[in-house]
Amino acid sequence: MKNYKAIVESLIQFHAEEEWFEFKENWFEQHAIGEYISAISNAAALRGKECGYFIWGVDDEKHEIVGTTVDYQKDYKKEPYQHYLARMISPDLYFSFHEIEISGKRVVVLDIPAAKRVPTSFDGIRYVRIGSSKENVARYPEREAQLFNVLIHGLPTLDTVEAEYQDLSFVRLFTYYAGRGITLRQENFEKNLGLRTKEGKYNILAQLLSDDCHMPIRVSIFRGETKASPLYSVREFGNTCLLLALDKILEYGDVINLIQTDERNRIMERKEVALFNQDAYREAVINAFVHNKWIDGNAPMITVFSNRIEILSRGTLAPEQTLEGFFLGESVPVNQKLSDLFLQLHISERSGRGVPKITEVYGRDVFEFRENSIVATLPFSIVGNITVD
């Protein structure tokens, strides 16, 4: 039996609803609920989730438990409602309603299994979530093709997606490994690192590790607190072997992390204060690389403002990753192959300390989970006035 109380408490921690779950207080349109079941079932499949959820009793803006009075057992057109839903949904889907109590308030959870093999339809129409809305997937051919591809072949990964570029070289990869005391052998390194698809083509992982990954990775510095401020500089670290790019970005953290002299309340000696916590920066950057959705062709983005650094990775948490588990350090990497490489090269240790190191310094609010990205924001500790010249 699922712990629906824990599920709800986990989902309300998200800053915004995602395509595989929906919050409402008392809204209940019986036919439209069937459309939502189709949409959420298909969205859950696209996200690699086992189930999606429609939850009543939660404010959909503030994500606060408010309780609900919905009656999901009343008949629809003289037919038992759940029988009506089951009759209209195809293929057969074992959805279920559950009543729970949280903080003394009634909450109703509709558990919706993800689509398997073929998309879930309601009344002959296949729906999908686009943002917070539900749409007929036939109106979006690319999304429909993606849904069928996921249902047939599974979620795309770094090692299953063919690279756009096939003329790849790996001189820098060999040098990097040698610098870590590991010898790669020309005759078997591609197989050992898993750099080709089943069809024998170079995959995205190979492209990332090649001498030119064809992905720009930039650190942008603005003079003010927003991107509307004057742009001070842009440093380019991409378009090389990803491992080298990561090292350079971590080293650049030392350059921008100004050490300030704090003479306030000075008695015996000056106090040196770093602009931000270097360990937290390192962990946030590595975390962004491991969880970034590289298969879409987009790299993480690091932006420095006058009062903070924002480290953005594309995509969302891994399907098996819960929000609470993420904060506890029970990490499920989005890119398992890349995570394995980082472990082998001692870039990360997979001990579960990365995220807790960040939250210990800055708290959980340092992370923002957006619809298609995760942002870690490290605020600056500023002594006096600092300006970028």
Q: At which residue positions do the language-model features occur?
A:
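Structural motif
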Residues: 102-103, 305, 370
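Glycine-rich/acidic phosphate-handling loop/turn and adjacent ATP-lid/helix
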Residues: 309-344, 383-389
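Interdomain "switch/hinge" adjacent to the Bergerat
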Residues: 92-96, 100-159
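Polybasic/polar functional segments that serve as interface/processing modules
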Residues: 1-95, 99-108, 116-118, 275
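Active-site helix-to-loop segments that bind/position phosphate- or nucleotide-bearing substrates
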Residues: 131-296, 304, 318-320, 324-331, ...
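Short, low-complexity, charged/polar intrinsically disordered tails
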Residues: 2, 369, 377-389
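Phosphate-interacting basic helix/loop segments used at nucleotide- and nucleic-acid interfaces
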Residues: 26-49, 186-194, 268, 283, ...
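A short beta-strand->alpha-helix segment at the C-terminal rim
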Residues: 357-363, 367
